[in-house]
Amino acid sequence: MRPGNEVKTERARRLRENSTDAENALWSRLRGRRLGGHKFVRQEPIGVYTVDFVCRESRLIVEVDGGQHAESQTDVARDNWFRAHNYRVLRFWNNDVLGNIGGVLETIVSVLAEAPPHPER
């Protein structure tokens, strides 16, 4: 394992163990290729960041945010970094996931249909 990866892996593990109700609700719909056969993973390190959910094949990141994220400059910087690395980013509020999971899933499916495939390396 590359230096620093242990720290990222441990942080991701802690985040998975302390998921919010909204993250758990969305994960139950994304896990096991339940959403159109797309493989999502949760609390995944990408660069210096850890994202809530990512479909690497479609380069789509899904973040579930609480009130602490309102107008966060940190989130703007994160999203800009991801976009610069050819990821698409969707953000949903916790209450949207908990109160309108169907609408959230429809949005994700719609974006997955548009998302470019993972670039060849």
For every predicted segment, state its role:
Residues 1-39, 112-121:
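Solvent-exposed, charged helical/coil patches
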Residues 14-20, 44-112:
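Basic, amphipathic alpha-helical patches used to engage nucleic acids or provide basic targeting signals
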